[in-house]
A protein has these predicted regions:
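C-terminal accessory segment of soluble enzyme catalytic cores
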Residues: 166-217
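N-terminal lobe of the biotin/lipoate ligase/transferase fold
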Residues: 1-136, 141-142, 167, 192-196
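Intrinsically disordered, low-complexity acidic/polar segments
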Residues: 100, 154-156, 169
Length: 217
């Protein structure tokens, strides 16, 4: 398996949605290989399918979001509500699970394993919590996962807190879970963590877990 990596820097959420849509169609048509898009977003709250009809997990008013410069978008991914912003590494794998990887549960667990390995590369012991999606250190979420799969081609993906301003998570109930916290690599390590190093570690871990040969890096 070959995967083409794109490291795009800071990209507005709406622009990234359009890019994903185009890449998904290209992948379905076999015009491109599997893709791994790595980027950051300006401050934005996104609503998964669980949150589109019930926004009670968005705690801030529209006026407060506007005052803080935080956008709000409905998405087609699974899950509830989450926050994206600068200092958070967002990954959008556009991967064709045909013909022998048609297992949504396995795919999500594999994404978790990628992020567990990334954390380990920085000396952090992260893991899973029973019944919950994502990657955790104790009772604090380090990385969130929310995916969409259409005709077995994936989109959306994961968000790893590197140097995220965690105060923005006070605007929401992250992933609809009220009794857990959030954390970041920088908070756990007590030092700055270069985003480029995290991107490189993510590419390495993704290649290992998915048995992929990265190109374009």
């Amino acid at each position: 398996m070959v995967i083409e990596v794109k490291r795009l820097g800071l990209v507005p959420y709406e622009q990234a949605l359009a890019l994903q849509k185009q890449l998904v169609e290209d992948r379905k048509a076999q015009r491109i290989p599997d893709q791994l898009i790595l980027l950051q977003h300006p401050p934005v709250i996104t609503l998964g399918v669980k949150a589109r009809d019930d926004r009670t997990h968005v705690l801030a008013s529209p006026d407060e979001l506007s005052r803080q410069g935080v956008e709000l978008f409905e998405t087609g991914r699974g899950g509830d509500v989450t926050f994206h912003g600068p200092g958070q590494l967002v990954g959008y794998p556009i991967v064709d699970l045909n013909p022998d990887r048609r297992d949504v549960h396995r795919y999500v667990r594999d994404l978790e394993e990628v992020l567990i390995q990334v954390a380990a590369s920085f000396g952090i012991s992260a893991g899973r919590q029973a019944g919950l999606t994502g990657v955790w250190v104790g009772n604090e979420k380090l990385a969130a996962i929310g995916v969409r799969i259409a005709r077995w081609v994936t989109s959306h993906g994961f968000a790893l807190n590197v140097a995220t301003d965690l105060r923005h998570f006070d605007l929401i109930v992250p992933c609809g879970i009220r009794d857990k916290g959030v954390t970041s690599l920088e908070r756990l390590l007590g030092r700055p963590v270069p985003m480029a190093e995290v991107e490189t570690a993510t590419i390495t871990a993704f290649a290992a877990v998915f048995n992929a040969a990265p190109i374009g890096v």
